[in-house]
């Protein structure tokens, strides 16, 4: 079995994302930009629902220029972020 690791960006990097039919098709962040060749998701995650600082997001794995990234849409902030790159 083969495995890959996610190297997280700390903090996550704000991204600009274009959608088609609610699916990311283009992204730009921190010098990376281009058409999304493949994507999987969204996976909905949330936490701390009992607190004012609750979080809720939709995560995607995407491929841009033969590199795999994890991105997410912060539902409460209405913003996209690049969370990390896969090795």
Role assignments for model-derived ranges:
Residues 1-87:
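Non-catalytic peripheral regions of nucleotide-handling enzymes
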């Amino acid at each position: 079995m083969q495995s890959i690791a996610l190297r997280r960006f700390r903090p996550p990097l704000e991204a600009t994302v274009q959608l088609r039919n609610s699916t990311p098709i283009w992204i730009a962040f921190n010098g990376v930009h281009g058409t999304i060749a493949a994507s999987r998701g969204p996976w909905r995650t949330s936490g701390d629902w009992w607190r004012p600082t609750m979080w809720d997001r939709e995560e995607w794995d995407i491929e841009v220029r033969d590199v795999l990234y994890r991105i997410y849409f912060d539902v409460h902030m209405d913003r996209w972020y690049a969370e990390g790159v896969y090795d």
